[in-house]
Amino acid sequence: MAEKKRIYKNDISSVLMLLALICLMAGGWYIARKKARLREASSLPFYKVELSQIADGEYEGQTMTSFLHLKLKVTVENHQLKDIEVLENDGIDGETAKPIIQKMIDENKVVVPAIKGAELGSLVYISCVSTAISL
């Protein structure tokens, strides 16, 4: 009977160690993905935009990353951001970061503070708008 208990305890220990190893590996993978996305977002093109130099019209911009594919139509009227329409939004943080559009329009600036909890998506939106009206 004592031998059965010992075998049972060894089985539980092995299972717990295996679960701990799986959790550590999953955590490492998650952290590595976050770092890769941060590196990718920080390498996006960001153009210094003077809205006073931008002619009235509609401009399309597209930014593709491994975590978010974004396509926007930016309307400039009287050197102000009049509207930013989302044409394509597919990926992580796309919907969560969408309120940054209203911030840009309200402040009439391309570079505005990121949406809390959707910082990487916010960077993609900023890059997409700056690319649209700069090129």
Outline where the language-model segments fall:
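Intrinsically disordered terminal and processing segments
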Residues: M1-K71, T75-L135
